[in-house]
Every structure is written in C-alpha cells, then in structure tokens.
C-alpha cells in the first residue's frame, strides 16, 4: 500500500501529485485556489527528497504562492484539506514563530484522524509551530548525517541530512527543512497506516546517532 503524503509548502505541481490546491491569505479569509508554479523552488526540492526511491501519492498544499511568508490560517486550511483527502502523513518543512489557535486546532484534527505529522524544528532555540504541538514528529538538520541516516536528538526530535538533493545534485542549503524531508523519507520507507507512536519507535531504533550534535567529532551508536 502506497503512502499518501501531503506536502504543505511552495510546490504546486508534480508528476506524483494526485491533487493540489493553493491557500491564499486574503483580508479576513483564506481562499482555496488552483495551485500554480513553485515561486521559490523550495517545495519542489523537498518533493525531490520525499519521492526519492519511494512510490508515493502526493497531495500538494501550496501555502507559499509568492516569495513572501504564509499565515497560520493558510497552513491550517491546507492541513484540513489534506485530512479530507485521506493523507497518511502531512509534511511541513516550515515553522511559524508563534502559537495560533487555528493551527493548533487543525493539528489536533489531523492527529485525531490518525494522520502522522512531520514538521521542521530548530535543533536549538525558540520553539516553532506546528513542530511544538504534542503529537507532531519534530525534525531538524544534523551535520553528522548523510542522506538516509538519522539521529535521535531527544525524545520525538530527529535529525537527518541538512542538505537537499535535486535532479542528482546536492545543495548545501536546507538545514531543518532538509532534515525534516529526510525524516519523512525514512518514515515512508515503512508500511503505511501505522500509528505515530510506532513510527517514533521505528525512527528511534534506526538512529545512527543518539544525543545532540556537538562541534567535536561524534561516535556512531552502531
């Protein structure tokens, strides 16, 4: 059974996409529109990682329709859209700087629907949302990790390669966004329709490194 993965980002078109929609913030409302071209390329590079050696059905929730920021309400609308389309996993290589009730409620609905959520989080520093919400798998970049390697930095916080790959090329850019993409890539290597707690256990067992990244050399756990 193939995973159905909702990518909430800037990407609006992919061969693997079974549905796509754009969520645009207007005064006092969120408009659902036809998805368009990726204005930044970020979401497309994330999609390259998610679909690398994986057969997945993508749902594209385009919340970055320009090079500017998105809103918590737009992300929440995209999450609800993904739930309605029976996403197994929602991937968010993004983080908002403040808690928003509308976003917290949407995340709660996704968790109640047994949808796994993977969201980018900084390895250090202030919390970001939706990664800070209970039940969300937090993911970040870890320079110790090569592509497809994982670290367990803390309970429920996983690190992975901090670089994005696109069309056979590797970019030095990425950080937490790239790490989150590689964590989702690891999740969808396993069977679909599994509980989030089982996914966390599987990621923890797979981790090559345990504990926070240090500036000194690290020894793998296995």
Residues covered by each model-derived region:
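Extracellular S/T/G-rich loop segment that most often corresponds to the catalytic His/Ser-adjacent loop
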Residues: 9-14, 128-192
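Gly/Ser-rich catalytic serine loop of serine hydrolases
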Residues: 32-44, 122, 170-183
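Structural detector of well-ordered beta-strand residues that form the stable sheet scaffold
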Residues: 59, 116-118
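Mature extracellular/periplasmic domains of secretome proteins
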Residues: 1-2, 70-91, 100-115, 125-140, ...
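C-terminal subdomain of the subtilisin-like protease fold in secreted/lumenal serine endopeptidases
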Residues: 1, 7, 88, 192-222
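Short glycine-rich anion-binding loops that position phosphate/pyrophosphate groups of nucleotides
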Residues: 11-13, 94-97, 123
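Subtilisin-like peptidase catalytic core
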Residues: 32-96, 206-210
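Active-site core segment of subtilase-fold serine proteases
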Residues: 1-56, 167, 211-216
